From Swiss-Prot:
Single strand-specific metallo-endoribonuclease involved in late-stage 70S ribosome quality control and in maturation of the 3' terminus of the 16S rRNA. Belongs to the endoribonuclease YbeY family. GO terms for biological process: rRNA processing. This is Endoribonuclease YbeY. Its EC number is 3.1.-.-. NCBIfam families: rRNA maturation RNase YbeY. InterPro entries: MetalPrtase_cat_dom_sf_prd (IPR023091), YbeY (IPR002036). Zn(2+) binds at H113, H117, H123. Keywords: Cytoplasm, Endonuclease, Hydrolase, Metal-binding, Nuclease, Ribosome biogenesis, rRNA processing, Zinc. Signal peptide: none annotated.
Length: 154
C-alpha cells in the first residue's frame, strides 16, 4: 500500500493529480523490481524545503534542504512497513530548471531513487553507485524517461 501525504499544497499546482502520479511511479517500479506481490507499505510525503531542511538537519546534521530523504524501517517482507520517502518540490523545481528536464521526469527519478534507498541500495561506493544508477536508468526507461546521468557522462 502506498500512503501519500501532500504536505506542501503547491504540488497540486505543478503536477496534475500528484497522488495518482506518485502511485503510478512507485507501483510500476515495484512491478518492474518483481516485488509488487510483497505489498509493502510505503509512505511518501510531498514536501517543501522547510520540512526537508528540518529532517536533513535532525537525521544527517546537514542544515540545508535536499531533494529526497529516505527512511527505511524494515527489510522487505509481505505487508511490511518498508519506509518513508520525503521529497522537496522546491529543490526538485530548481534542479529541473538547472538540468533542463521536465519536473515530472525529475520527480519520477527522485521517487525511484528514494524507493531504492528504502530497499537498502546506496551509492557510497563506486560499485554500489553503478548498481543503483543502473536500476534507476532501467526503471526510468520503462516509464519513457531518458537516462538522467547521460549529461554527466558526456
Amino acid at each position: 500500500m502506498i500512503e501519500i501525504n501532500v504536505y506542501y499544497k503547491k504540488w497540486y499546482n505543478v503536477i496534475r493529480k500528484p497522488k495518482s502520479f506518485v502511485k503510478n511511479i512507485i507501483n510500476t517500479s515495484l512491478i518492474d523490481l518483481n516485488i509488487y506481490e510483497y505489498k509493502p507499505i510505503i509512505s511518501i510525503v510531498l514536501a517543501n524545503n522547510k520540512l526537508l531542511q528540518q529532517l536533513n538537519y535532525e537525521y544527517r546534521k546537514k542544515n540545508k534542504p535536499t531533494n529526497v530523504l529516505s527512511f527505511p524501517y524494515n527489510k522487505l517482507d509481505k505487508n511490511c512497513y518498508l519506509g518513508e520517502i520525503f521529497i522537496s518540490l522546491d529543490v526538485l523545481m530548481n534542479e529541473s530548471v538547472d538540468l533542463n528536464i521536465p519536473i515530472e521526469h525529475h520527480t519520477s527519478h527522485m521517487l525511484i531513487h528514494g524507493l531504492l534507498h528504502i530497499l537498502d541500495y546506496d551509492h557510497e561506493e563506486p560499485l554500489d553507485q553503478y548498481i543503483m544508477e543502473s536500476i534507476e536508468i532501467k526503471l526510468l526507461d520503462k516509464l519513457g524517461i531518458k537516462n538522467p546521468y547521460v549529461s554527466r557522462e558526456t
